[in-house]
Amino acid sequence: SDVFIVSDMADSQQKYAMKVEKQHGNIRAVLKLDVMVLSCMQRRGVVGFPMMIAAGRTSAYKYLVMQMLGPDLGKLRRSLPEKRFSLATALKVALQTVDRLHALHDAGWLCRQRREGAKSGGWNDEQDNGQIYMLDFGFARRFRDTEGNLIRPRANAALVGTFQYAPLAAHAHKDQSPKDDLESWFYMTVELIKGPLPWGNFKDYHQMGNYKKAIRNEKRSDFLSGCPDELGTIMDSIDRTQFFEEPQYDLISREIRSAAARADVDLEMPFDWQIERWMFRRAHFVGDLGESNMASERLANADDSDNDRSSLPVDATPPLESR
């Protein structure tokens, strides 16, 4: 699907995001799932999911109009020289995103696409509300039916979502459950704290899967080095959870808060991009895989008198897939 910025005809200052998808010829139709999940969360009054304004179709296209949001977490993270957030921001994001997953699971849905695709709350730095929003549900799947009954796992399942964050169950072509969403969330959280994941440049998903197994054994200490000790407890809790078992969301949140307290981190402080306002501008120039040379040139010539950081070194090297 393609995304456009649109305005309210009655108020040109009111901006929205419109996702558009062809009626036919898509490799994978995703807009229907976006509408189903967002309308479900909207009916439940859950925070942290973009408000759906309108949805419909024409003879050629399907469309979804929704609340305009800011850059995704991946672009904000990659806008930084070290490609990682401060510990305070990483833990705040972790706390909010695990709450979003808990709400999604309570509604009977799996995300199956947990990556840094969650977004900040404003489409520019002045409108940011400190809220992290979850969106992009093209790979979502129900694990409970409409009566609330658990759906039996299939014998085989396709590997879907972003390989970097795929859980071990996905690598084994098994159906996923809420604990697998949390495993993907865990990889994302480590990346927010430390920077690109060690398997980020691997081309083969089997190789990625083998490395993910190794971090449970001989590579555990290397993988978790530089992270609060509490992350080891969180990983163990996720790994112990069985397919039909409810994950220990409360334990995970407690451990994140414990990590913050032990590191003397104030979880009420603003996000990095709310302090360093140049991050918003720079994130808009960062592509899905990295920062382009053209973006670097535009940033170097940019004029932003408010908290100007255009003189900072800009990474103009060819992007790595992990970035």
For the regions a protein language model found, what residue spans apply to each?
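Conserved activation segment of eukaryotic-like protein kinases, specifically the C-terminal portion
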Residues: 152-170
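ATP-binding glycine-rich loop module of kinase domains
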Residues: 2-34, 39-40
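Short beta-strand micro-motifs within the conserved protein kinase catalytic domain, predominantly
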Residues: 51-62, 70
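Extended, low-complexity, intrinsically disordered C-terminal regulatory tails
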Residues: 217-226, 247, 252-254, 261-323
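Structural motif in protein kinase domains
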Residues: 69-79
